[in-house]
C-alpha cells in the first residue's frame, strides 16, 4: 500500500451510516482519498434512485444540476449553485452564493457559508466553512473549522505534483497535481490564513489568523497558546 499519513491518524471514526465505506477507509493513506471521491459518488448514485435524492425543499432560484443528493432538514439558500455529482447529508446549512462545483461529499450538520466554493472535496460531520472560503481537493475532519477568508490552496505555482510531509519530516510523493489541505478532527485555521498545497493538520491543531502554512502540524507540537493568542482566535 502507498506510504503516507493514514486516515485513522486524523479521524477517530467514520459515521456508522456512511455510504462510502466500500471506497474510503481509515486504513488508506489520506491523500489517496482525493482521487477516490469521484468513484465513491459514482457508486452511491448508481444505487440511489432519482426519486430519493432530494429530501429538502429547493428554493426556486437555487441552481441544482447533475447527480445531487440533498438530505433531510437541509437549510438551502435563496440563490447559489450546486453542480453534481454532490452529496449533502441531513441538517446541513448552505448560505447565499454557495458554489458546489462537483465531486463534493458533505456529512451531517455542516455549514457551507456565503460565497464559499467547494470542489472535489470531502467534509465529515459538523464541519464549519462559514465565510468566503475556498476548499479544493481537500478533506476536513469532524468538527473542523475554517475562519473567514481562509483559503485551502490546491495547486503549486510551478504546477508540479504535490508532496506531503510525514510527522517525522519525511516527504511523500502523492503523485497528485492538485491537492489542497487535510484537516483532522477538530483542527482549525484562523481568518485569512492560507494552507499551502499538501498541508496537513492533525486533530485539534491550529493555524493562526493570517498565517501562511505548509507542511504538517501536530497538535501536541504547537506552542502553548498565550492569552494574546487565545484572544486572536476568538
What spans do the regions from the language model cover?
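Terminal amphipathic alpha-helical/low-complexity segments used for targeting or macromolecular assembly
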Residues: 1-60, 199, 204, 210-211, ...
Amino acid at each position: 500500500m502507498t506510504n503516507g499519513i493514514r486516515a485513522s491518524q486524523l479521524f477517530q471514526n467514520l459515521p456508522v451510516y456512511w455510504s462510502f465505506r466500500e471506497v474510503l477507509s481509515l486504513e488508506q493513506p489520506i491523500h489517496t482519498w482525493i482521487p477516490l471521491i469521484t468513484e465513491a459518488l459514482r457508486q452511491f448514485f448508481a444505487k440511489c434512485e432519482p426519486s430519493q435524492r432530494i429530501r429538502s425543499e429547493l428554493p426556486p432560484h437555487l441552481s441544482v444540476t447533475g447527480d445531487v443528493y440533498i438530505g433531510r432538514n437541509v437549510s438551502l439558500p435563496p440563490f447559489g449553485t450546486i453542480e453534481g455529482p454532490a452529496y449533502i447529508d441531513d441538517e446541513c446549512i448552505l448560505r447565499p452564493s454557495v458554489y458546489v462545483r462537483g465531486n463534493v461529499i458533505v456529512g451531517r450538520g455542516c455549514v457551507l457559508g456565503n460565497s464559499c466554493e467547494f470542489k472535489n472535496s470531502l467534509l465529515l460531520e459538523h464541519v464549519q466553512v462559514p465565510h468566503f472560503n475556498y476548499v479544493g481537493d481537500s478533506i476536513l475532519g469532524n468538527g473542523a473549522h475554517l475562519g473567514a477568508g481562509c483559503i485551502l490552496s490546491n495547486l503549486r505555482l510551478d504546477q508540479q505534483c504535490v508532496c506531503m510531509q510525514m510527522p517525522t519530516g519525511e516527504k511523500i510523493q502523492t503523485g497528485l497535481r492538485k491537492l489542497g489541505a487535510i484537516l483532522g478532527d477538530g483542527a482549525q485555521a484562523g481568518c485569512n490564513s492560507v494552507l499551502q498545497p499538501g498541508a496537513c493538520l492533525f486533530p485539534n491543531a491550529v493555524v493562526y489568523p493570517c498565517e501562511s502554512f505548509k507542511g504538517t502540524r501536530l497538535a501536541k507540537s504547537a506552542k502553548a497558546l498565550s492569552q494574546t493568542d487565545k484572544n486572536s482566535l476568538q
